[in-house]
Amino acid sequence: MGDVEKGKKIFVQKCSQCHTVEKGGKHKTGPNLHGLFGRKTGQAEGFSYTDANKNKGITWGEDTLMEYLENPKKYIPGTKMIFAGIKKKSERADLIAYLKDATAK
C-alpha cells in the first residue's frame, strides 16, 4: 500500500477543498469521508447524492477506490464530483493509504 504522509499532502492539495475526513466533520461540496471503507456508494448520512452514486451499489475499499480515483466520471457516470482523477497509480495508492487511516479515527 501507499505512504500515509504523502497521501495526506495529496488530500490537502486535491481533495480537502470539497471533502472532510474527521468523525463528525461537515459535508462541503462533497461528502464527509469518515467511515468510507466498507460503506456503499451514496450512503454518507445527510449528503445529497446523485442517483448514479446511490445506484452504483459497490462497497468502498482499496480496489474500488483505486479504480474510481483514476477517473471518477468513467467509474460512476453521472457523479457530481468534478474532479478529473489521479492518473499516477502510486499517488492513488498514497491517497488511499491516507484515507484508510484518516477516515477510521
Swiss-Prot record:
The keyword Transport applies. Heme c binds at C15, C18, H19, M81. It is found in: Mitochondrion intermembrane space. PROSITE patterns: CYTC (PS51007). GO terms for cellular component: cytosol; mitochondrial intermembrane space. Its main location: mitochondrion. The modification N-acetylglycine is found at G2. InterPro entries: Cyt_c-like_dom, Cyt_c-like_dom_sf, Cyt_c_1A/1B. SUPFAM superfamilies: Cytochrome c (SSF46626). GO terms for molecular function: electron transfer activity; heme binding; metal ion binding. Pfam families: Cytochrom_C (PF00034). Binds 1 heme c group covalently per subunit. Keywords: Acetylation, Electron transport, Heme, Iron, Metal-binding, Mitochondrion, Respiratory chain, Transport. Gene3D superfamilies: Cytochrome c-like domain. Electron carrier protein. The oxidized form of the cytochrome c heme group can accept an electron from the heme group of the cytochrome c1 subunit of cytochrome reductase. Cytochrome c then transfers this electron to the cytochrome oxidase complex, the final protein carrier in the mitochondrial electron-transport chain. Belongs to the cytochrome c family. This is Cytochrome c. It comes from Anas platyrhynchos.
